[in-house]
Amino acid sequence: MSDIAERVKKIVIDHLGVEADKVVEGASFIDDLGADSLDTVELVMAFEEEFGVEIPDDAADSILTVGDAVKFIEKAQA
């Protein structure tokens, strides 16, 4: 797992209080990890702060899984 993926995983665990083994690439924040719409907004804000990237609202709407977040951040930092 990449450094970005590890950091995303830690943020998700900290914000949602889920077990580490549930935070996998294909895990949906809402369907698999129990996040609600406020949780997803808070996650996006945490990703922006942690990685120093801006995630526009339209992009945030397409970040549905842990893997989506990792891919967006990797692309934004490239």
Swiss-Prot record:
It comes from the Bacteria. The keyword Lipid biosynthesis applies. Residues 2-77 form the Carrier domain. The keyword Phosphoprotein applies. GO terms for biological process: lipid A biosynthetic process. Pathway: Lipid metabolism; fatty acid biosynthesis. Its main location: cytoplasm. The modification O-(pantetheine 4'-phosphoryl)serine is found at S37. Keywords: Cytoplasm, Fatty acid biosynthesis, Fatty acid metabolism, Lipid biosynthesis, Lipid metabolism, Phosphopantetheine, Phosphoprotein. GO terms for cellular component: cytosol; membrane. One of its GO terms (molecular function) is acyl carrier activity. 4'-phosphopantetheine is transferred from CoA to a specific serine of apo-ACP by AcpS. This modification is essential for activity because fatty acids are bound in thioester linkage to the sulfhydryl of the prosthetic group. InterPro entries: ACP (IPR003231), ACP-like_sf (IPR036736), PKS_PP-bd (IPR020806), PP-bd_ACP (IPR009081), Ppantetheine_attach_site (IPR006162). Transmembrane segments: none annotated. It is found in: Cytoplasm. PANTHER family: ACYL CARRIER PROTEIN, CARRIER DOMAIN-CONTAINING PROTEIN. Carrier of the growing fatty acid chain in fatty acid biosynthesis. Belongs to the acyl carrier protein (ACP) family. This is Acyl carrier protein. It comes from Allorhizobium ampelinum (strain ATCC BAA-846 / DSM 112012 / S4).
